[in-house]
A protein has these predicted regions:
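Immediate post-signal peptide segment of exported/extracytoplasmic ligand-binding proteins
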Residues: 20-37, 65-73, 165-172, 342
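Extracellular/periplasmic Venus flytrap/periplasmic-binding protein
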Residues: 86-90, 135-138, 143-250, 294-295, ...
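Extracellular/periplasmic periplasmic-binding protein-like sensory domains
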Residues: 247-324, 397-399
Length: 401
């Protein structure tokens, strides 16, 4: 009997050791926790975007209360970088070298993200779902540890350009965007969508602004004076609201007014600008808008409202940035589910580059899909127009494979 008991005990020890050996952990991961790092502008000119980080913290709290991911709780550490690249460098180094996080999740901004891209790739730390759509975030060959999330800015503006060519072939176009890599990507994308011949013929004015500019009034007045009857604008929420209001106040009524999808928040952009000035603006979207009556009986939208009520009661439900933050958090949970018990940096990045899933708040027909050679998780969208109260979708899904 004694030898029999010893044999069973030995077998159990071997089985336990084998099971433990199946688990692989890199920095920031253990049997009980997955530690994520993030930089977000809680202060500075882009502070409206900080609601994304707040949403994700609330979402992970919900997931943790439900038992976590594969039994592990998600610990999100978010540091303020004020939308300042030097500050992003400082805070990211702190997250990697002191906190030893598993990933840098959804850091906000192209100029800020670029400031740490080489550092994170040299360290082989996943820069996961960067909160920007500059085309350079798809550079999987040179920067395999950095992956974007939303449709690329060039893909987005190509949709607007094609809409103009189809519906107003004699347009006089003005382009207004932020003077950084993101803004230039938007401007170049619009021109690329028009084609060289149409760009030379149709683009009559182009102007930029700095994220630190206290006002953009002079640029708007200059663009109106060009005689343009179609306007495309990329701006962070503060300047977007200023510009829309100024356009309305000086009586400029472009026949078409396209607004970059990064600044479509009703609460932080359109409401401050004035709904009367915002009516008729066109943009694009890939998610369900919980304020759109067509989704009032949708179970996934109802689940979002339940989440908001319990975990983020102070959040403004008219802020589309909250929906974005929620979807990114869902995608992050999907990555960690796929990781199983292998939570090394290598496997986290491998799973992020092998996604094929439809998340609950995505519009019908739009998927989250990546591959080792495709670092743009979302590549489809629909056009939407602001009716003075909410955004209304129109047209077909564009960019779906």
């Amino acid at each position: 009997m004694r030898w029999h008991a010893l044999a069973i005990a030995s077998a159990l020890v071997v089985a336990t050791q084998a099971h433990a050996a199946d688990k692989k952990y890199g920095p920031g991961a253990s049997d009980t926790e997955i530690k994520l790092g993030q930089t977000s502008p809680f202060s500075g000119p882009a502070s409206a975007y900080s609601v994304i980080a707040k949403t994700q913290a609330a979402y992970f709290k919900m997931i943790n209360e439900q038992g976590g991911v594969n039994g592990r709780k998600i610990n999100l550490i978010t540091l303020d970088d004020a939308y300042s690249p030097p500050k992003t460098v400082e805070q990211t180094r702190k997250l990697v070298e002191q906190e030893e996080v598993a990933v840098i999740l959804n850091p906000l901004g192209t100029p800020t993200g670029l400031a740490v891209r080489k550092y994170l790739n040299d360290k082989k730390v996943p820069q996961l779902f960067v909160g920007a759509g500059a085309t350079l975030w798809g550079d999987h060959e040179r920067f395999p540890w950095s992956i974007g999330f939303q449709p690329s800015y060039q893909a987005e503006t190509a949709v607007y350009a094609k809409y103009v060519l189809k519906n107003k072939p004699d347009a006089k176009i003005a382009l207004f965007y932020q003077n950084d890599d993101a803004g230039k990507d938007y401007g170049n994308g619009f021109k690329k969508g028009l084609g060289p011949e149409n760009t030379a013929k149709m683009v009559v004015a182009e102007s930029t602004y700095e994220s630190t500019d206290p006002t953009i009034d002079s640029q708007i007045v200059k663009l109106k004076a060009s005689g343009a009857n179609v306007l495309f604008m990329h701006a962070i929420p503060k300047q977007a609201a200023q510009a829309i209001r100024k356009i309305g106040e000086i009586g400029w009524k472009p026949d078409m007014f396209f607004l970059a999808a990064t600044s479509t928040s009703v609460s932080s952009v359109l409401q401050p600008a004035g709904f009367d000035h915002s009516k008729g603006i066109i943009s694009s979207y890939s998610f369900k808008d919980p304020n759109d009556p067509q989704w009032k009986d949708d179970k996934d939208v109802q689940a979002w409202h339940d989440f908001m009520k319990k975990y983020f009661p102070d959040g403004n439900r008219q802020d589309q940035l909250i929906v974005y933050g929620y979807v990114v958090a869902e995608a992050t949970v999907q990555v960690f589910k796929q990781c199983g018990d292998d939570l090394t940096h290598e496997n986290i990045m491998k799973q992020a580059a092998n996604l094929d899933v439809t998340l609950p708040l995505m519009l019908p027909g739009i998927k989250l899909k990546t591959s080792p050679t495709d670092y743009f998780p979302i590549e489809a969208m629909r056009l939407q127009k602001f009716n003075g109260e909410i955004w209304e979708l129109f047209g077909e899904t564009i960019g779906n494979d």
